[in-house]
Amino acid sequence: MPTPLRILSGVTLAYVRIGFVYLVAGPILLLSSITGLLIVNRDAFFVMELYGFVTMVVFGISYFFIPGIAYGKIASILVARIQLVTINLGTIALTLALSGDFTPGQTFPLMVGGIALILASALMHTANLSITIRSGLKAHDSKVKQA
């Protein structure tokens, strides 16, 4: 039985909404840097846009479309929700590590932690959708053979 559309929509919208927050926050951070209001490394802007906006939107949309294409349901909504937290924490940690006027030794743990969380989120996403695709296609193939 497919995952209810209400649940898929909720997960997708959570990713997309948060992604658009990053889309707006990134240019604000960049503008603050250009105007001298804040001293911010521009790498922080790119982290916000790539991981905060692009990755969040891609993750959210894939959780909506992949189950339908694979004739199944998301393997784990819980993993999708945990992943939402880890990608956000990783993006925020990496943005903070790259944005401040800190010495590299001070920001290194924050940077490594942020990258580790982003990587963990990507691995969770890949595993969750791989299981979704495999189980959905197996179920679909067995129904086709029975018909």
Residue ranges and their predicted role:
Residues 1-147:
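Hydrophobic alpha-helical transmembrane segments of multi-pass integral membrane proteins
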